[in-house]
Each structure stands twice: as C-alpha cells, then as structure tokens.
C-alpha cells in the first residue's frame, strides 16, 4: 500500500471513521474546498461528517505530512554520515510521534561543543569503549595511561578517565530506548512541585496561596492547575519543578549498562550514570514533560473557550423587538440607545441617576418618556460597573409603566473594545465611544451573533487562562468556531455587515468589504447571481460561499433557502413532480406532499443522493430554520435581587455566564456571579462541567453559601 493511503488509513483508525470518507475529505480539502462547504454540501462523499470531524482530519493530515517530511529529512541526514542501518531506518519509518523521530536522530545530530565532543577530539573514545566492555581485571589505570598526551592536552590519568566518562554519559543520554523509558516512568511515578518564588510577597490577594507548598503526581495534575502554576512561575511568584523517581531511574540504567555483572569499573560507571542522568537527561526530560503538560493544558483551555464561545454565538436573537440599550456608569452617566427591530439607531441619550450627580427623578422621567415614545419592548442592561444600581433604577421605572416591559442583563464583555475600534468608528462616526457601547449592548440582545462577530473573540469574556495559552492556536480555534456558527446560521446578504460576511465560507475580509460596497452602490441584491459581478469573487469563491448567503424577497424564491444553486435544477424538478412551484416554499401544502415522498426512489429519479434530497426537502419546508431557535431564550426579568437578600437553600433561576474546569459561574441577578463547583453540578460523577452545562443555559440553582464581605456566592445545582 502506498504511503499516502497508509496515512489515510491511520487517520481513519485514530478517529474511528471509514477510510473511504476520510480519503474523500482529504481530496475535497486539497481541491480548495472550505470546511463549512464540505460539511453542508458534500455529505454523500463524507458520510455526513460535521465541521469538527472534518477539521480534525485536516489537522491530523497536516501533522502526519509534517511528520513524514521530518522522517525523510532525518533518514537523509543519517545516510549522509554513512550510519544508516536497515534497523534504524525501519524504526524511524515506524515512529508515530515527532518526539520518537527526534530521539532516534539525537545520537547522529551534529552537536555543538560539549564535554563529550571535546573528549572525542582528544582521542578518548577507545578508552570509553574499553570501559563499556565491563573489564573484570584491574587494567584501567594502565589503559588510561596510554592516552596521556601533551599534544592532545590530556595531562593525567584522571583527565583521561574523566573524558571517557563524559563520552559514555552522552552515549547514555542519546540512547532512544533509555529516553523513552525514562520519560514514561517520570510521567507515571514523578510529581510536579511548586513553592513560593522571589516575588511571592506581591501576591497580595493570595491568588497562588495553595501553590506555595504544593505537590501532585504528574499523571493526575489537571489542566487548570498546570496553567495556574505556569502563570505563577511567569510572574516569579512560584517556583515550579518536576520531582522524578531518580533512584528508580538510576537503578534501571545500571541494570541496562552494568547488567548485574562483576566488573572493576562498576564505581566509575555508577558515577557516569549519575552524571548522565543529572546533567543531561533529567533537565531535558523535565523540559519535555513541562512542555507536554502545558500543551495539553493549552488544548483544554482552548477547547473550553471554543465551546463557551460557540454557545454564546448561538444565543437566540430577539427578533422584531425594539430595544433600549443601557451602558451603566456612575460619574459619567448611563448611556442610552434605542435600536429598532432592524438594528437602526433611533435615539441616543444620557442620564445621571447615581452618585455623585444623583439626578434620579430627572433620569426616571427621561427613560419613561423614551420607553413610551419609541414603544420599547425590552431593556438591555450591560453587566459592567454600576450594573446592579442601574438595574434597580430601571426596575423602578418599569414599575411605573402602564404596560409590562421586561429587562435582560447582557454580558457586555468586549463592548468597550468594539466601541473604540476602527470598525465602530466607521459604523457610527458621529457617536462617542460610550454611546456606541450602548448601541452594542442593545444589539447584542437583538442579534448576538451579528454583534459579537465585530469583537475579537478573545474579548468576549468566556475563557479560562486565555492570555497564557498559545495565541496562534487560540486564534485559529476561535476563528474556526465563529466560521462554523456563522455558516450554520446563514447570512442575509442584504443586511449583514462586512464583519459578519468575512466569516462566510470562502470570503476574505477584502471580498466581504467588496460585497458591502456593491450593495451600497445598487441598493440591494435581488438574487444570488448578482454576487458573481463582485470584484475578486471568482467561480471557486462563489461556489463556496453562495449557499450560506440568503437573499430575502428577491427574484428567485430559492435564494432565501440554504439550498445551493448547484441543486436548483433538481429542486425545481422535485417541485414540478409534486405539482407545485417555488411560490409554495414553506407552505403546509408543500410540507404534506414532501411527507408522503418516497425518498430513495425520488433521489434516484432526480439523479442526486438521498442525503442531499433530505436536506433540500428540509429547506423547502422550513426555509427560515435557524439552529438558534432550539436554544432557550435569555432570562427575562421584572425585579431585582441584592446579595443581602440571599439565604442558604434559596431556589433561584440563573444564566450560565462562564464554564471552567472546576465549575460554572452563574448570573443569579446579584452583583457577583455565583460559582457552582464541579462537585455540586449533579448527583452523578461529572468528568467535566461542559458535560452538564453550557454558556447561556438557564439553570435552577440553590444558594449554598454567601460571603457578603468578599462578595462571594456558592451555588449548587443539586437540591
């Protein structure tokens, strides 16, 4: 079997999918297709894989190709030294990790100046070889004397033996089987320790207190503790080290090298093993293990952030509602923005209900007037500084209204970042930064996805140690999440911002800008075909993006569905077969006829796959289908709660704001989000909080404890 097929077989085995489908995915990716396009429109070829599975195949294929490239390079480099044996070549070819390849290459690597290379240059290698024969006679002194040479700067017997020991120490360190065993045993039996560092006195809030005298088995340490220790070490507050099972390792090395034989050089070899392990092996293995722990912890933190972001982006929109956005503040006043059902800003204002200005009565009347004048249906209050005081003020105004108006506390993380951005300046050139924040808060309630894509995903406030992980990997992962969600939901090409359009499959930032420019020139697009005229939107880009772009009330009714234009001919043939037309999309009559359809036979008749036909039928019956409709709506509120009102055992409803390794933070309407520790999430064992809760979930909780002094609330989801 050729190498490429073997690699594809390996990926299929790793992720538990059929080789045929894995090969199709790789072929589609190499042909320049995007992940969302493959997931949505090539289901027959992929066996209906989702975006995550396709992305996993893409990443594994990339890794395996890089691994193979390195294998070829290492084989070539060793062959150039005339040291490549069949056995070594086979070992390199069979390696499944980059680390294994590097271990095998280590003895042949061109080394910089080391104690061993210096000793070799002095001609001491034969003496090292002699010691490794484990001689029983006591001829070492006489043998070593033969290597004394002023010319080679070996002046004494001791220097000759010392040089030979350095050569042996490096040979031990370079032996791949030893390294592999030591790495595994250190992982299995070693511990990770932390202690107070030089700057421990700067840890005023005792954030790292639990790590001042801390030790835990490497095999059991959880990702968030690794990240905490890494951060503490970076800030010089902690010292972190790996404590290996040193005696166990040295005993193993003695057994491998001295082989329990009686020899006159036992003591010398024991000293050499000690030196090799302490000076060469242990520091390198410690670095490797710390790196591996950090990489795993990074991946976990990125996974949590990505999952939280996905849930946040999938929050359901409040369609067709006029919203008053409130950006709370004390001294500078609360900024107000009224946004109509299309997101158009109708009114901008400011009120000063709090200290030090205290114009509460005037503010009360102003808000009341705005609510009436613009027929506001919802109030969105940002959850930053002065949020709870503003919530109390708004509740008092709402009580004074003749009709019922609800309010929602909106997570405003990143709103200030957006407000000061170039994008916000372009969108609202006449508004001040904080006025833009109020608009952003209102629109976050109306359409969270459209608003959140304008912000750097790292600023949305749902991460865990996100500033400590690999920023490149984090950015890649978060971009993938945003792209996946945007394409799953679909985009109205006549209302979407360039910020939203740039995440549509195949569209770059500049092409998204060209789409908006063209729209502004012509007023609006009347069908999908018109997008072919956009500069730099070529045939391949059009194929990738067009199914995710919707044209509402255009000249072609199919353009408002998720059906790809490549299937329009078959779709119209299907409608004709049913005695209907595109005018019947979304009607009960069409739904009834499709329900009676023999899918398998119809697919054969139309010359398309059964899965594609199923998707077409779904779009014809529910063209407005939005995956966000399944998600619970935000918690609507009419009254306010104080920290002092909380009593142990009290039952409350709350919104999950963040999920981390050790639990979930829930907004229950008081100043501080309460923590549900992982042990209080369920009656059953919970491996990870994400198995039970997600960002945006509405949950029932019970108050477990309140610390008014520290402003901390402990919650439980177990009654």
Swiss-Prot record:
Recorded GO MF terms: mRNA binding; structural constituent of ribosome
Protein name: Uncharacterized protein YdcI
Keywords, alphabetical: Coiled coil
SUPFAM superfamilies (UniProt xref): Nucleic acid-binding proteins, Ribonuclease H-like, RuvA domain 2-like, Tex N-terminal region-like
Source species, domain of life: Bacteria
A single GO BP: translation
S1 motif domain span: 649-718
Coiled-coil ranges per UniProt: 64-100
Lineage, broadest ranks: Bacteria, Bacillati, Bacillota, Bacilli, Bacillales
């Amino acid at each position: 079997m050729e190498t490429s097929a073997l690699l594809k077989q390996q990926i299929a085995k790793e992720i538990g999918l059929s080789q045929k489908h894995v090969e199709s995915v790789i072929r589609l990716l190499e042909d320049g297709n995007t992940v969302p396009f493959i997931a949505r429109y090539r289901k027959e070829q992929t066996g209906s894989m989702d975006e995550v599975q396709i992305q996993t195949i893409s990443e594994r294929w990339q890794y395996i190709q890089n691994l193979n490239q390195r294998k070829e390079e290492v084989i070539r480099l060793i062959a150039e030294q005339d040291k490549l044996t069949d056995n070594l070549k086979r070992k390199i070819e069979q390696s499944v990790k980059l680390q294994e390849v590097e271990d095998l290459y280590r003895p042949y690597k061109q080394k910089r100046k080391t104690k061993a290379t210096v000793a070799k240059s002095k001609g001491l290698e034969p003496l090292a070889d002699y010691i490794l024969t484990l001689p029983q006679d006591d001829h070492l002194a006489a043998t070593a004397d033969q290597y004394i040479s002023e010319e080679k700067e070996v002046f004494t017997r001791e220097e000759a033996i010392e040089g030979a020991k350095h050569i042996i120490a490096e040979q031990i360190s370079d032996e791949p089987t030893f390294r592999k065993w030591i790495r595994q045993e250190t992982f299995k039996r070693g511990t990770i320790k932390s202690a107070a560092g030089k700057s421990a006195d700067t840890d005023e809030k005792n954030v790292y207190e639990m790590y001042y005298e801390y030790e835990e088995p490497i095999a059991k340490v959880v990702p968030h503790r690794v990240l905490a220790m890494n951060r503490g070490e970076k800030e010089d507050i902690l010292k972190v080290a790996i404590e290996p099972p040193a005696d166990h390792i040295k005993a193993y090395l003695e057994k491998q090298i001295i082989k329990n034989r009686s020899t006159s050089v036992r003591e010398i070899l024991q000293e050499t093993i000690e030196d090799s392990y302490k000076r060469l092996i242990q520091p390198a293995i410690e670095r490797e293990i710390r790196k591996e722990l950090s990489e795993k912890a990074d991946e976990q933190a990125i996974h949590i952030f990505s999952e939280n972001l996905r849930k946040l982006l999938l929050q359901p929109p409040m369609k067709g509602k006029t919203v008053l956005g409130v950006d709370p503040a004390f001294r500078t006043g609360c900024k107000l923005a009224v946004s109509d059902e299309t997101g158009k800003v109708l009114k901008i204002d400011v009120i000063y209900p709090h200290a030090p200005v205290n114009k509460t009565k005037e503010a009360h009347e102003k808000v009341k007037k705005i609510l009436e004048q613009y027929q506001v249906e919802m109030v969105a209050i940002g959850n930053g500084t002065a949020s709870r005081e503003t919530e109390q003020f708004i509740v008092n105004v709402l009580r004074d209204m003749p009709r019922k108006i609800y309010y929602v506390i909106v997570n405003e993380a990143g709103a200030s970042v957006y407000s000061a951005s170039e994008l916000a300046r372009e969108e609202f050139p006449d508004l001040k930064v904080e006025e833009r924040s109020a608009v952003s808060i209102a629109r976050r309630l109306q359409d969270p996805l459209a608003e959140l894509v304008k912000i750097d995903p790292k600023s949305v406030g749902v991460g865990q140690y996100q500033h400590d992980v690999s920023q490149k990997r984090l950015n890649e992962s978060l971009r993938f999440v945003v792209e996946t969600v945007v394409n799953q939901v679909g985009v109205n090409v006549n209302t979407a911002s360039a910020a939203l359009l740039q995440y549509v499959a195949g569209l770059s930032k500049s092409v998204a800008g060209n789409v908006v420019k063209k729209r502004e020139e012509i007023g609006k697009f009347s069908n999908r075909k018109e997008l072919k005229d956009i500069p730099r939107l070529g045939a391949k880009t059009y194929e990738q993006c067009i199914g995710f772009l919707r044209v509402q009330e255009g000249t072609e009714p199919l353009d408002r569905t998720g059906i790809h234009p490549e299937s329009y001919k078959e779709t119209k043939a299907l409608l004709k077969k049913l005695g209907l037309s595109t005018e019947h999309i979304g009607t009960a009559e069409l739904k009834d006829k499709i329900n009676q359809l023999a899918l398998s036979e119809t697919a054969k008749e139309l010359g398309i796959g059964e899965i594609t036909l199923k998707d077409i039928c779904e779009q014809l019956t529910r063209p407005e289908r939005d995956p966000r409709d399944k998600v619970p709506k935000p918690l609507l509120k009419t009254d306010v709660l104080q920290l002092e009102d909380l009593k142990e055992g009290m039952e409350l409803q709350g919104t999950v704001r963040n999920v981390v390794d050790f639990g979930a933070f829930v907004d229950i309407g008081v100043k501080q989000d309460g923590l549900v520790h992982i042990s209080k999430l369920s009656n059953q064992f919970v491996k990870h909080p994400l198995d039970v809760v997600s960002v945006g979930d509405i949950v029932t909780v019970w108050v477990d404890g309140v610390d008014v002094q520290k402003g901390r609330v402990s919650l439980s989801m177990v009654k």
